[in-house]
Amino acid sequence: IFRIFATMQVLRLWFFWVCSLHFITTPMLVKTHAIVLRSLKYGDNQLITDLLTEAFGRVSFVSSIPRTQKAKIKKQLFQPLTLLEIEFDHRPTARLQRLRDARMTYPFTSIPYSEAKLAIALFVAEFLSHATRDEQQNVSLYKYVETSVRWLDGAQHAFANFHLAFMIRLSRFLGFYPNLNDYTRGCLFDLRSGCFVASIPMHNDYLQPDDAAQMANLMRITPQTMHLFGFSHHERNRCTQLAINFYRLHIPNFPELKSFDVLRAVYGE
């Protein structure tokens, strides 16, 4: 009797193990919204694309490069910051997912046709690809990015400071938004703690008063008020570098952004 009981227990455990394995490996059909961050040609006929999705956060996909105009998924869909609705079989253990279908949900009216907006879009897409590298599902963050992209495309003027407002406000969703409450003229900014201080901290990651004042200005910029901030080319580029440095301290292995050079060239040094 004991042997029969033991055998039944083993069979029961085996059954649950098989069921759980089936659950883990069986793909689940998913439809979600997504934003294109970057794409890279892989081999002769494949494309690897990094997307920020509403349902799963960051996801990497592989797809075949379409050879004809009749192809279901067109290469043009994978330009930086394109807003999509995608359908795919989600395999939790797979490094690369495979798209079933993709369609554009918001055709751009100005970003691809404006040199200045395109430079900003390329910069923001590269920035996001590093800032959200390990991001899981975060619907609030996704909605913020989507709304911001739509705003940039629809803006008629006064959008040169868009990326500055976007970078600083994104940090709120990532958990290290700076604290403006303690700012007073002449104080320093502690990059590690993200707050303004009256005395030099016990490390070298801080901003002198002039740069600290610029950081305070960055935190006041919104899409509605950015036209009030008349930065010179030099000041805007300096503020961009300050924001990048802030992210590099809070996100491991955050690199210098190659597209920053393009942004500098478009807006001047």
Segments predicted by a language model, with ranges:
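Tryptophan (W) side chains
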Residues: 14-17
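Non-catalytic alpha-helical scaffolds and adjoining flexible linkers that form interface surfaces
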Residues: 23-269
